[in-house]
Regions:
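Structural motif
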Residues: 48-50, 71, 122
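Surface-exposed coil/turn segments at beta-strand junctions on protein surfaces, enriched
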Residues: 47, 97-99, 112, 121
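Short, well-ordered beta-strand segments enriched in hydrophobic/aromatic residues
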Residues: 52-58, 127-130
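Beta-rich strand-turn-strand
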Residues: 62-67, 107-136
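Core FKBP-type peptidyl-prolyl cis-trans isomerase
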Residues: 62-90
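An anionic, turn-rich surface loop/hairpin at beta-sheet edges
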Residues: 81-105
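Short coil/loop residues immediately preceding or within conserved phosphate-binding loops
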Residues: 40, 103, 114
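N-terminal leader/pre-domain low-complexity segments
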Residues: 1-53, 78, 83-87
């Protein structure tokens, strides 16, 4: 599991991108239109007096397949759940499990103690604990 602390502000849409509340949804800057398809796994994001905690359901992965990026005001979690074929040719009657790259972008309200951030992947769940710098 790769974990990086970054001291720059996060730019969600990238350079040159504009966010419009109204207007033609098909007219977007080229880098956004050409982005690879990503999915978003189920997530619980909770806050207590002393910390923020994120729990993500992503079974079938290893710690090395996650990248956790901690920006000044956003936590970004990326990964790539690989497709594991059974080897036999088959037709699907139902296919609800998502595979491939995923990305979560979660805002961080307030200051956190970056030296005490921890992450653990266990039994199909990735849990990230973000202790508050000044707990209330």
């Amino acid at each position: 599991m790769r974990f990086r602390r970054l001291s720059i502000r996060y730019r969600e849409l990238g350079p040159g991108a504009t966010l419009r509340l109204f207007g033609d949804p098909w007219i977007l800057p080229l880098p956004i239109r050409m982005a690879r398809p990503e999915w978003r796994p189920p997530v619980d994001y909770r806050e207590s007096d002393g910390e923020l905690a994120v729990k993500i359901e992503v079974a079938g992965m290893t710690e090395e397949q996650f990248e956790i990026l901690l920006y000044q005001d956003v936590l970004v979690i990326e990964g790539d759940r690989p497709w594991r074929s059974s080897g036999a040719e088959a037709r699907f009657h139902l296919a609800e499990i998502r595979y491939g790259p995923f990305r979560l972008e979660l805002p961080i309200p307030g200051d956190i103690d970056r030296e005490r951030v921890t992450a653990r992947y266990e039994q199909g769940f990735l849990t990230v604990h973000l202790p508050k710098a000044n707990p209330t």
